[in-house]
Amino acid sequence: MKSVLAIFSILTLTSVVALGGDPASKEVVIGISDAFVPGGFDSDTDAYVVVSGMFPNSCYRWKKADIAHVDTFEHEITSIAQVSQGMCLMVLVPFTRDIQLGRLDTGKHILRFKGGDGTFLEKTLIVE
């Protein structure tokens, strides 16, 4: 019985290695729950925001934030997660990330955080 179990274990491990080891993954747009916009930025400092939200399960991992500068004072931020296939814990997983916006011109900036379902969260950033 032990030898059958040992052979089964070896075959299972070998098949995982032969298949590449990593399950398939894809990128998806995720929505955020809130965005904290600190104050005190000037045109000589790099501006940033802190976003937070919930992943639907443990297969989601933060990947990146795509920033589109629509014009000088309007910016659209899209949060991207990587979802891997496989066994996942079906629990909400909180996340918090800093998003670097770079140096911005003096004035009132509109930040639009786009979600995957067409909705967005809008915040204002004042650069002195």
Identify what each model region corresponds to.
Residues 19-70, 75, 119-128:
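Primarily secretory-pathway and cell-envelope proteins
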Residues 71, 103-105, 117:
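Short loop/turn positions at the edges of beta-strands in beta-sheet-rich folds
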Residues 109-113:
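A short tyrosine-centered beta-strand micro-motif
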Residues 4-14:
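Sec-dependent N-terminal signal peptides
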Residues 46, 106-108:
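Extracellular Ig-like/FN3 beta-sandwich strand-entry sites
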Residues 78-103:
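An anionic, turn-rich surface loop/hairpin at beta-sheet edges
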